[in-house]
Curated annotation (Swiss-Prot):
Required cofactor names: pyridoxal 5'-phosphate
Disulfide-linked positions: none
Source organism superkingdom: Bacteria
One cellular component term from this protein's GO annotations in UniProt: cytosol
Subunit structure of this chain's protein: The glycine cleavage system is composed of four proteins: P, T, L and H. In this organism, the P 'protein' is a heterodimer of two subunits.
Record carries keyword Protein biosynthesis: no
InterPro entries, sorted: Aminotrans_V_dom, GcvPB, GDC-P_C, GDC_P, PyrdxlP-dep_Trfase, PyrdxlP-dep_Trfase_major, PyrdxlP-dep_Trfase_small
The protein's name: Probable glycine dehydrogenase (decarboxylating) subunit 2
Gene, per the UniProt record: gcvPB
UniProt organism field: Thioalkalivibrio sulfidiphilus (strain HL-EbGR7)
Enzyme class: oxidoreductase
Length: 496
């Protein structure tokens, strides 16, 4: 039930003082409302109960296991939140001069340096992108700016493997490139012959995730980097899966020229629900002139923002100020808590947990998409045979998992694996939690074989069960209040 449906005329949390004409006398007539604002009217208790009930329906990492593949739903240490909310940080205004922001700027400079060190991007890091997708855009925009500066306008193509993150082709297109898809071979690696055939004078670069979304490490990455560079292109690294190699392997050492990092994933800042995010970008020396601004510089013992005057070839600003400051501070605290010795342990335990769950699920009878490969931080189970034999699909299994108080893994992604579940346990989960998840999956598999209708009817314990997904897509209702969309159409004289 929406809060508007709980509204009762005349009910309110506080008494409203009568409006005096003198209060609005200076307000032009065209800005004065002719009718009451269409806001819900409830008592304070009704409002508190409404939102408390909604919060109790939420699924979060604070309450249950969240193995959502390629999303790195790890626990966010509370110390990161507490320190990021110190009064000195909260009270700083974005327009405050550098001289009044030395503590904040020092943290941002150190964060840039730590990210540069752990990724091997020697040209530097910019923290200004406010989401992973914006970081992607910044990365490809820098590739474009690099070629444009060299007047190499023939380079109109970006190569994207078919196992890439779904946003990669969209990003390349937004930057004005034509996308060429590169197939994956049977072992989960980039098809090298197809790559060689695609490279040429029109190649601007290639977008890669390593480990890939298939949950395997691209074993011939150095050869790929050499081939792309020999063809005159650049390598973009999608940092979606950086958690698997943190402190172990550096993208810069693999030959990448630009990387975006999801600080809201790998570096444990809260995410989900649309934000806030942080998509910091790191570059090699050749792309440093094109970095998005502002970037924090250290001069002696003082810190300042570098602007257009310092980087005249910059692709420009991507946020009004300097990125999501609160998210960046949380990532900074997280990295300081881990230290140089702690970062490799993130990769070690995330891959250990993934391989443990993968091995146990295989023992329980689940089919792996790439049985001959070790998992990195995530892996893929394919239910194509189960669906053929029982008509129980990956979506059915995902729905049934909700009844066991586990969030479903990512379903039907990546697209090239049929009936797939992409499972990422992260490094912060205990063996007991992982064992419980495995047993739940095994029980669902047995149900699918003996009582398929039970699985196909799930979930049974949720406030909402199965939705009419076709109707939801065709009769979209995302208005801010019931009937609002129709009212606005009528007011503007538009027709459906």
């Amino acid at each position: 039930m929406l809060i508007f449906e709980r509204s009762r005329p005349g009910r309110g949390a506080t008494a409203q003082a009568p409006l005096r004409e003198a209060t609005v006398s200076g307000l032009p007539e065209r800005f004065r409302r002719g009718t009451r604002a269409p806001l819900p009217e409830l008592s304070e208790l009704d409002v508190v109960r409404h939102y408390t009930r909604l919060s109790q329906k939420n699924f979060s990492i604070d309450t249950q296991f969240y193995p959502l593949g390629s999303c790195t739903m790890k626990y966010n240490p509370r110390a990161c939140n507490s320190l990021a909310m110190l009064p000195g940080f909260l009270g700083r205004h974005p327009h405050a001069p550098d001289t009044h922001s030395q503590g904040f700027l020092a943290c941002m400079f150190e964060l840039q340096e730590m990210l540069r060190d752990v990724t091997g991007m020697k040209g530097g890091v910019s923290l200004t992108p406010m989401a992973g997708a914006q970081g992607e855009f910044a990365g490809v925009a820098m590739i474009r700016a690099y070629h444009d500066a060299r007047k190499d306008t023939a380079r109109t193509e970006i190569l994207v493997p078919d196992a890439a993150h779904g946003t990669n082709p969209a990003t390349a297109t937004m930057c004005g490139y034509t996308v060429k898809e590169i197939p994956t071979d049977d072992s989960g690696d980039v098809d090298m012959e197809a790559l060689k055939a695609a490279l040429g004078p029109h190649t601007a670069g290639i977008m890669l995730t390593n480990p890939s979304t298939l949950g395997v490490f691209e074993r011939r990455i150095k050869e790929i980097a050499d081939l792309v560079h020999q063809a005159g292109g650049l390598l973009y690294y999608d940092g979606a899966n950086l958690n698997a190699i943190l402190g172990k392997v550096r993208p810069g050492d693999m030959g990448f020229d630009v990387i975006h990092m999801n600080l809201h994933k790998t570096f444990s800042t809260p995410h989900g629900g649309g934000g806030p995010g942080a998509g910091a970008v790191g570059v090699s020396e050749r792309l440093r002139p094109f970095m998005p601004i502002p970037v924090v510089a250290k001069e002696g013992e003082r810190y300042r923002f570098m602007t257009e005057k310092d980087l005249p070839q910059s692709i420009g600003r991507l946020s009004a100020f300097a990125g999501n400051a609160g998210v960046l501070l949380r990532a900074y605290v997280y990295m300081r808590m881990l230290g140089r010795a702690g970062m490799p342990r993130v990769a070690e335990f995330s891959t250990l947990n993934a391989n443990y769950v993968m091995a146990r699920l295989r023992e329980k009878g689940f089919e792996l998409a790439f049985p001959g490969r070790r998992a990195t931080h995530e892996f893929i189970v394919t239910l194509k045979r189960l669906a053929k034999d029982t008509e129980v699909t990956a979506m059915d299994v995902a729905k049934r998992l909700l009844d066991f108080n586990y969030h479903a893994p990512t379903t039907y992604f990546p697209l090239l694996v049929p009936e797939c579940l992409l499972i990422e346990p992260t490094e912060t989960e205990s063996k007991e939690t992982l064992d419980g998840f495995v047993e739940a999956m095994a029980e669902i598999l047995e149900e699918a074989r003996t009582s398929p209708d039970k699985v196909k009817g799930a979930p049974y314990t949720q406030p909402n069960r199965r939705f009419d997904e076709v109707r939801a897509a065709r009769e979209l209702d995302v208005a801010w209040r019931p009937g609002a969309a129709l009212d606005e159409v009528a007011e503007q004289g538009r027709t459906d």
